[in-house]
From Swiss-Prot:
Sequence motif: Unconventional nuclear localization signal, positions: 1-18
Organism: Influenza A virus (strain A/Silky Chicken/Hong Kong/YU100/2002 H5N1 genotype X3)
Pfam family, one: Flu_NP
Function: Encapsidates the negative strand viral RNA, protecting it from nucleases. The encapsidated genomic RNA is termed the ribonucleoprotein (RNP) and serves as template for transcription and replication. The RNP needs to be localized in the host nucleus to start an infectious cycle, but is too large to diffuse through the nuclear pore complex. NP comprises at least 2 nuclear localization signals that are responsible for the active RNP import into the nucleus through cellular importin alpha/beta pathway.
Maturation and modification: Late in virus-infected cells, may be cleaved from a 56-kDa protein to a 53-kDa protein by a cellular caspase. This cleavage might be a marker for the onset of apoptosis in infected cells or have a specific function in virus host interaction.
Chief place where the protein resides: virion
Protein name: Nucleoprotein
Family from the record: Belongs to the influenza viruses nucleoprotein family.
Superkingdom, taxonomy of origin: Viruses
Molecular functions per Gene Ontology: RNA binding; structural molecule activity
Motif Bipartite nuclear localization signal per UniProt: ranges: 198-216
Length: 498
C-alpha cells in the first residue's frame, strides 16, 4: 500500500515479503506457485483423477474453492457458532467431474477441512502459505471480472453502469490482504466505502464502542488504499477529506461518487497480475519444472510461457462456442477483462470480441444443470506475443493527470491512442461544485477538460515475441484510431449476484 510509504512490488505483496531484490522476488513467487502445483497434484491423487480429469478447469476450480474454504478462519468460526441445517461446518467439498463410458458425470465430494489444510501445508513446506491462497482468490476474481458485469451492484450504490471498467476485483474476499488491495479498481474501493457509510447512516451504533473503533480503523485504511490509487493531488486531497470526516454520511458518498466518475478520465493505478488455475501449476510441477530455482513473475513473460505449453480442458454446454469459452478464460488468466480489445487481440493473435457477442456462459456449472449433453474441449490459451502487465492506468503526461482510457483499465504496458468521447463523460459533471470540496472538484474538472483524446498512452512501449524473454525488441502496434475497444459496452452479460 502506497500510503505506508513503502513501495513494494506486486510480487512482494503477493508473497508477503518486505523489500527484496528481483532475484529473491522471483524465487519467492516461484515457491508460491510450486506450492499450489504440489497441492494440486496431491489432491488429484487423493481423488483418483485421471490425467484428463485433472486438466479439467472445472475440477481445478472446485479444488481451489475447497482449500480457500478450509482456510477461511472467520467463516469457519461463524459456522461453528451458527450450525445450518444439513451442513457440516467442519467439511468442505464440491462437484468433481469424471469421464465415465464416454460421458461426463458429476460427483459431489466431501472432505474434512482439517485434511485439506494438512495437504496444503504439506505441499507448502509445512507453512500456511497465505500468499498462495491469495493468488487463488485473485484468479477467481479475475475470472469473475471477465464473466460477469456488475451493473446491479453499481446501481445499488448510486453509481453508474458506465463505470464498470473501475470494478476490477469487486468479488475478492475481504481477507485478500495487500496483494488483493493492489488489484482492486477505484470503483471497487468506492463501492466498499459507500456500503460502509450507508451502514453507518442506518445503524446508530456502527461507529460506536469498541467495535466502532475497529470499524473506524478499517474505514480509514480503505480510504488510504483508495487514496494511494489516485495519481493527482486534487483527487488525493479529496480522499483526505473523506477519511477525516467526523461521522461519514451523504456528503462523503457524493464525494466518493464524484471521485469514481473522475477516475474514468484521471485513471487510478490498479495492478494487474496473471494468476492461472491451480491445474496449470500442477501440470508444470508434474513435468519436473522447478519454479523456485527458475524463478517466476506474475507480470512478465512467465505466465505466457506457461500457457503456451499447457493443455487445459473445459466442459462445454450444448450451444456454447468453444472458441468463446477459450477467450473468456484467456482474459481471466491475464486479468484483461478491462483492457482495450484492440490491445488484447493483438497480443493474443486472434480477434477478442466484446462480452455481448460471446456465445458462452460462465465456466462453472450449476448443480442443477443436466450433464447428459455436456461435452469437453481444449481451451486455446496460447498467445502470439507477450507484454508486461502495468499498474499505471495509462495516463499520458508523466503518467499523472491526463486522459486515461475511458471504459478501459489498461492491463498491458503497450502504446495505444485514447479514443474517447469526452462530452459523454463531462456531462456527468454538471453543476455541483459547492461544499467543502469545491476547490478540489473545480481543479479535477479542469484537469479532465484539458485531457486530450488524441494523446498516446504508454508511449514507445510494445509487445514482445515469445522468444524474446529479456524484452529487448519491443514491437509497437498501430491501432485503428477511432475504434475504441471496450469489452463490456452495450452488453447484457449475466450479473455476478444472480
Amino acid at each position: 500500500m502506497a500510503s505506508q510509504g513503502t513501495k513494494r512490488s506486486y510480487e512482494q505483496m503477493e508473497t508477503g515479503g518486505e523489500r527484496q531484490n528481483a532475484t529473491e522476488i522471483r524465487a519467492s513467487v516461484g515457491r508460491m506457485v510450486s506450492g499450489i502445483g504440489r497441492f494440486y497434484i496431491q489432491m488429484c491423487t487423493e481423488l483418483k483423477l485421471s490425467d484428463y480429469e485433472g486438466r479439467l478447469i472445472q475440477n481445478s476450480i472446485t479444488i481451489e474453492r475447497m482449500v480457500l474454504s478450509a482456510f477461511d478462519e472467520r467463516r469457519n468460526r461463524y459456522l461453528e457458532g451458527h450450525p445450518s441445517a444439513g451442513k457440516d461446518p467442519k467439511k468442505t467439498g464440491g462437484p468433481i467431474y469424471r469421464r465415465r463410458d464416454g460421458k461426463w458425470v458429476r460427483e459431489l465430494i466431501l472432505y474434512d477441512k482439517e485434511e485439506i489444510r494438512r495437504i496444503w501445508r504439506q505441499a507448502n513446506n509445512g507453512e500456511d502459505a497465505t500468499a498462495g491462497l491469495t493468488h487463488l482468490m485473485i484468479w477467481h476474481s479475475n475470472l469473475n471480472d471477465a464473466t460477469y458485469q456488475r451493473t446491479r451492484a453499481l446501481v445499488r450504490t448510486g453509481m453508474d453502469p458506465r463505470m464498470c471498467s473501475l470494478m476490477q476485483g469487486s468479488t475478492l474476499p475481504r481477507r485478500s490482504g495487500a496483494a488483493g488491495a493492489a488489484i482492486k479498481g477505484v470503483g471497487t474501493m468506492v463501492m466498499e466505502l459507500i456500503r460502509m457509510i450507508k451502514r453507518g447512516i442506518n445503524d446508530r451504533n456502527f461507529w460506536r464502542g469498541e467495535n466502532g473503533r475497529r470499524t473506524r480503523i478499517a474505514y480509514e485504511r480503505m480510504c488510504n488504499i483508495l487514496k494511494g490509487k489516485f495519481q493527482t493531488a486534487a483527487q488525493r486531497a479529496m480522499m483526505d477529506q473523506v477519511r477525516e470526516s467526523r461521522n461519514p454520511g451523504n456528503a462523503e458518498i457524493e464525494d466518493l461518487i464524484f471521485l469514481a466518475r473522475s477516475a474514468l478520465i484521471l485513471r487510478g493505478s490498479v495492478a494487474h497480475k496473471s494468476c492461472l488455475p491451480a491445474c496449470v501449476y500442477g501440470l508444470a510441477v508434474a513435468s519436473g519444472y522447478d519454479f523456485e530455482r527458475e524463478g517466476y513473475s506474475l507480470v512478465g513473460i512467465d505466465p505466457f510461457r506457461l500457457l503456451q505449453n499447457s493443455q487445459v480442458f473445459s466442459l462445454i454446454r450444448p450451444n456454447e462456442n468453444p472458441a468463446h469459452k477459450s477467450q473468456l478464460v484467456w482474459m481471466a488468466c491475464h486479468s484483461a477483462a478491462f483492457e482495450d480489445l484492440r490491445v488484447s487481440s493483438f497480443i493474443r493473435g486472434t480477434r477478442v470480441v466484446p462480452r455481448g457477442q460471446l456465445s458462452t456462459r460462465g465456466v462453472q456449472i450449476a448443480s442443477n444443470e443436466n450433464m447428459e449433453a455436456m461435452d469437453s474441449n481444449t481451451l486455446e490459451l496460447r498467445s502470439r506475443y507477450w507484454a508486461i502487465r502495468t499498474r499505471s492506468g495509462g495516463n499520458t503526461n508523466q503518467q499523472r493527470a491526463s486522459a486515461g482510457q475511458i471504459s478501459v483499465q489498461p492491463t498491458f504496458s503497450v502504446q495505444r491512442n485514447l479514443p474517447f468521447e469526452r462530452a459523454t463523460i463531462m456531462a456527468a459533471f454538471t453543476g455541483n461544485t459547492e461544499g467543502r470540496t469545491s476547490d478540489m472538484r473545480t481543479e479535477i474538472i479542469r484537469m479532465m477538460e484539458s485531457a486530450r483524446p488524441e494523446d498516446v498512452s504508454f508511449q514507445g512501449r510494445g509487445v514482445f515475441e515469445l522468444s524474446d524473454e529479456k524484452a529487448t525488441n519491443p514491437i509497437v502496434p498501430s491501432f485503428d484510431m477511432n475504434n475504441e475497444g471496450s469489452y463490456f459496452f452495450g452488453d447484457n452479460a449475466e450479473e455476478y449476484d444472480n
